[in-house]
UniProtKB/Swiss-Prot annotation:
The active site is at K125. The gene is ligB. Belongs to the NAD-dependent DNA ligase family. LigB subfamily. InterPro entries: DNA_ligase_AS, DNA_ligase_B, DNA_ligase_CS, DNAligase_adenylation, DNAligase_N, NA-bd_OB-fold, NAD_dep_DNA_ligaseB, NAD_DNA_ligase_OB. It comes from Salmonella agona (strain SL483). It catalyses: NAD(+) + (deoxyribonucleotide)n-3'-hydroxyl + 5'-phospho-(deoxyribonucleotide)m = (deoxyribonucleotide)n+m + AMP + beta-nicotinamide D-nucleotide. GO terms for biological process: DNA repair; DNA replication. This is DNA ligase B. Catalyzes the formation of phosphodiester linkages between 5'-phosphoryl and 3'-hydroxyl groups in double-stranded DNA using NAD as a coenzyme and as the energy source for the reaction. Keywords: DNA damage, DNA repair, DNA replication, Ligase, NAD. GO terms for molecular function: DNA ligase (NAD+) activity. The keyword Manganese does not apply. Coiled coil: none annotated. It holds the Pfam family DNA_ligase_aden. SMART domains: LIGANc.
């Protein structure tokens, strides 16, 4: 498939501001796009926290929230109103504020953050819903949703129905405030293979609904903070375990450097765990007194999240490719994203009909993942731009019998045919990829797919972009091609048969091939009636007949009299 580059449409220009990619929108459009995305996130947020229903995947919501912040910064807009927290319906004050956790982008950032800090531990970043548990006189008296970090919903009645959460405590925990994550209990969850499963939304839904007491049996608790607890981390973990919060001790490791953090992160990513995770949290054993905790100011802990299995990517252009068979395929060019250490900047959408059904235009946000063998795959459209400027696809008159000869409308299928004939399935012209064929055709204006046979060594050497060594190699390859078998030349002409079928036919000349009947072709391996008819159509095509005579004049084996 070759790109129909002349049909590319609506490319969005981008510039860098403070390290972020910014769309080059006029101010009015920027304001409109930001307002629309902000409203959509607010609507999803409201549904999520009021109804316990997720209208969009957790990862998609997080990435679009980050995209909104990026756009706001690009235009110098205040980002404080970004709807990343639940609507503030709850009025129950937290005894100790939830600080949140700073996100670190990569290992280098982890190394920098760890520098100068001591007594560090790493824990899995459990994916669920944050909560405050308040124990007084040995009894659970309050449970409060995270809310905005300072106050939240009173979840006490629901939390008391979760069997895995201790209702009574003793000793130092008899009067204590704990912060943790309510999670969906899993058996043998391998994050790398099973993904996030929208666990956060499922937990929120269970806690919001009024008619699902039995579902709460599937929830667990991971305590990640005991404000004003024992200063000694092993003692803190031991007391939590004795009180029934055993997971914290089991999944807390001492770390001295970023390498140890990375090993733990990779281990938890690939090992069977009892919960869904989305990264790791590194924390100092020594914490400030709880009276100093404030939302967004927890500098004694940081998170290193796993890369998402799917990335939200901005469509920068829509392009069309025409293959040697005439099939038109739509390709979306993307503002590059990283998936599994691979830089992804384009994704195949499929046919024109499929593209129209997806309704994708430049400026849209799409979810992209990697399919088998690391091939980018379109999963869904998660956000559509207000402006819907779409390109017009090329005419659909192309087929398997068009564009053996060059013309303005045949440019891309013609190039596809050149790439095919140079492949190992045909003439095996080593070193001849799409770029080389384009350079030769643009310079020497081929009449048809075999015009390169008439090029001299001097002409090849004078082709822009061809170094001396490369031009000599191509000259040798072109000369060697003259000695290729008749079967390979027929394959280069795109006969609609497999090489195995051609070998079984036993034809060694064009004259023999012309004498074959449709019945003969039907009997060949993997052929049948339909393909046999296509062979007859191919053989009788005027362009194919003309090419066969031209090859005969060039003394190509099998085409002479």
């Amino acid at each position: 498939m070759r790109l129909w580059k002349s049909m590319a449409w609506g490319i969005l220009l981008w510039h860098s501001q403070s390290g972020a990619l910014c769309p080059a929108w006029p101010p009015a459009r920027a304001a409109e796009e930001i307002a629309r995305l902000q409203q959509q996130l607010a609507d999803w947020n409201d549904i999520y926290w009021k109804q316990g229903v997720s209208a969009v995947d957790d990862s998609v919501y997080d990435q679009l929230s980050a995209r909104l912040v990026q756009w706001q910064r690009c235009v110098g807009q205040d980002v404080s109103s970004t709807p990343v927290s639940p609507p503030l319906n709850g009025t129950t004050m937290h005894p100790v504020a939830h600080t949140g956790v700073r996100k670190l982008a990569d290992r280098q950032a982890v190394e920098q953050w760890m520098r100068g800090r001591s007594e560090l531990w790493v824990q899995p970043k459990v994916d669920g819903v944050a909560v405050t548990l308040v124990y007084q006189n040995g009894k659970l008296t309050r449970a409060i949703s995270r809310g905005n970090g300072l106050q939240g919903e009173d979840w006490t009645p629901k939390i008391r129905l979760i069997p895995s959460i201790p209702q009574t405590t003793q000793g130092a925990l008899a009067n204590a405030v704990l912060q943790g994550e309510i999670f969906l209990q899993r058996e043998g969850h391998i994050q790398q293979r099973m993904g996030g499963m929208n666990a956060r939304s499922k937990v929120a839904g269970m806690l919001m609904r009024q008619d699902n007491a039995s579902a709460l049996n599937s929830l667990g608790i991971f305590i990640w903070a005991w404000p004003d607890g024992p200063a000694n981390m092993p003692e803190r973990l031991s007391q939590l375990a004795k009180a029934g919060f055993s997971l914290t001790k089991k999944y807390s490791l001492v770390v001295k450097d970023a390498s140890e953090v990375e090993r733990a992160r990779q281990s938890w990513l690939t090992s069977a765990l009892p919960f869904v995770t989305d990264g790791v949290v590194i924390r100092m054993a020594k914490e400030p007194a709880s009276q100093y905790w404030r939302p967004g100011q927890g500098d004694w802990l940081a998170a290193w999240k796993y890369p998402p299995v799917a990335q939200v990517a901005q469509v920068s252009a829509i392009q069309f490719s025409v293959g040697k068979s005439g099939k038109i395929t739509v390709v979306a060019s993307l503002v590059p994203v990283i998936l599994d250490d691979k830089r992804v900047q384009r994704v195949n959408i499929g046919s024109v009909k499929r593209w129209e059904a997806w309704d994708i235009a430049p400026g849209d946000q799409i979810l992209v993942s990697l399919a088998g063998q690391g091939i980018p795959r379109l999963d869904e459209v998660v956000w559509r731009s207000r402006e819907r400027s779409k390109p017009v696809p090329p005419d659909s008159h192309f087929n398997s019998l068009t564009c053996f000869y060059a013309s303005a409308t045949c440019q891309e299928q013609f190039i596809s045919r050149l790439v095919w004939l140079g492949s190992r399935s045909a003439l095996g012209l080593d070193g001849m990829g799409e770029a080389s064929w384009r350079a030769l055709h643009q310079t020497h204006r081929f009449e048809h797919i075999f015009s390169w046979l008439t090029l001299t060594s001097a002409q090849i050497a004078n082709t822009p972009g061809f170094a001396k060594g490369k031009s000599e190699q191509i000259w040798r390859q072109f000369n060697l091609a003259r000695r290729q078998s008749f079967t390979r030349w027929i394959m280069a002409m795109d006969i609609p048969l497999t090489q195995a079928a051609l070998q079984a036919s036993g034809d060694r000349s064009w004259e023999q091939l012309l004498m074959r009947t449709e019945q003969h072709w039907r009997q060949l391996p993997a052929t049948g009636e339909r393909r046999a008819g296509r062979v007859i159509d191919w053989r009788n095509n005027p362009q194919i007949k003309t090419l066969s005579r031209w090859l005969a004049a060039q003394h190509i084996p099998g085409f002479g009299s």
